[in-house]
Amino acid sequence: MLETPKVLLKNLQDCKIHFIGIGGIGISGLAKYLKAQGATISGSDIAISPSVKYLKALGVEINIPHDPKAIKNQDAIIHSAIIKEDNTEIQRAKELKIPILSRKDALYSILKDKRVFSVCGAHGKSSITAMLSAIFPFFGAIIGAHSKEFDSNVRESANDSLVFEADESDSSFLFSNPYAAIVPNTEPEHLEHYDHNLERFFFAYEYFLDHAQKRVIYKEDPFLKNYSKDAIVLEKKDIRNIQYILKDGEPHTSFELKDLGAFLVWGLGEHNATNASLAILSALDELDLEEIRNNLLNFKGIKKRFDILQKNALILIDDYAHHPTEISATLKSARIYANLLNTQEKIVVIWQAHKYSRLMDNLEEFKKCFLEHCDRLIILPVYSASEVKRDIDLKAHFKHYNPTFIDRVRKKGDFLELLVNDNVVETIQKGFVIGFGAGDITYQLRGEM
């Protein structure tokens, strides 16, 4: 059983809450949601980010960098998972005896009275959550990425129902109070949080599913295929006649689901049809089928997930994929998109590995995932995400790709410049380029740094 957090957020209309690490996508989502609920929000982070800029524009006071003077008379402090005990603001809050909550403890207070459609899995959870938010336009939403439908990762609603992207990386999904638990896959990752114990890892997923009134699962997953309790089940054979089209110049997937007829959804790839199918099945007892079919058309994709930044002489796509399975699936989508555009350009990949631990844990899979649809591989330095640097010979491990190694990429108008030691070594003016990574590559590709 989970231990109920001792500190609960109450009376949000009068509550003053300070967020440490407010620029992160998960923490910023909670900050936006609680502000909309009536709380007074402040925060801090180590650097300016788009989320910080957005919150500042809403009138939120944010300190860059962390500053103990920012801790005054708040009712509670909420911090991201990467914030350590020796953080100066944490120490000041302890001195003032202000209650301190981790993000996952705060979730309990925020979600405990909500009817939550909670989506969790190694891959696809952001897309499924955003698809559900399109299907349920009157529900609130907290997503781990920006939905292009409403240009935010949060949508406030007076409705008690909420679609929520849950996080398995720190087991916070167990605090999400799922009315409906939607799980597309359970591929092991973030095992350091589970003491590298697979039994403990899968038990967490089982607990998550067991405590939901409604469960929607993809039975092709090795763990989920053996789940024995009642669940709405999706299998690969349930999805038929997958086709890819350009609709108003935008990539779409059409498919037939079970005996429910045909659906159309933004995006490309079999995984896209699978994600949409899980969202549809989650909504069947909530809405009329035709309303689901029509509302799904409002899904316009999410930022950093096959995010088409430009499509002129240089086709440029930004994608958050940072795991070999995700990269492989997205490269297939890139090939489909290139075919739809009738371009003969080779697919150039710019890859920024995210975290040394993930790179080392999945090294053999990373070495294979670019084989099928990558014509040229360009490799950026590893984005450490505050991890200690490890020695790894990327040139030796990836020599079969004959890769190009650079320090950074810079957007210059409609072109991309590749830099080594601050010198431009190449300019890409035309072609098909897709960037992969969960670090700052997204800002490099967008010319935001």
Swiss-Prot record:
Name assigned to this protein: UDP-N-acetylmuramate--L-alanine ligase
Enzyme class: ligase
Assigned GO CC terms: cytoplasm
Upper lineage: Bacteria, Pseudomonadati, Campylobacterota, Epsilonproteobacteria, Campylobacterales
GO biological process entries: cell division; cell wall organization; peptidoglycan biosynthetic process; regulation of cell shape
Known role: Cell wall formation.
InterPro entries referenced in this protein's UniProt entry, alphabetically: Mur-like_cat_sf (IPR036565), Mur_ligase_C (IPR004101), Mur_ligase_C_dom_sf (IPR036615), Mur_ligase_cen (IPR013221), Mur_ligase_N (IPR000713), MurCDEF_pg_biosynth (IPR050061), UDP-N-AcMur_Ala_ligase_MurC (IPR005758)
Catalytic activity: UDP-N-acetyl-alpha-D-muramate + L-alanine + ATP = UDP-N-acetyl-alpha-D-muramoyl-L-alanine + ADP + phosphate + H(+)
Protein keywords: ATP-binding, Cell cycle, Cell division, Cell shape, Cell wall biogenesis/degradation, Cytoplasm, Ligase, Nucleotide-binding, Peptidoglycan synthesis
Species of the source: Helicobacter pylori (strain Shi470)
Pfam families in UniProt: Mur_ligase (PF01225), Mur_ligase_C (PF02875), Mur_ligase_M (PF08245)
Homology family: Belongs to the MurCDEF family.
EC number: 6.3.2.8
Subcellular localization: Cytoplasm
Known pathway: Cell wall biogenesis; peptidoglycan biosynthesis
Binding site for ATP: 121-127
GO molecular function: ATP binding; UDP-N-acetylmuramate-L-alanine ligase activity
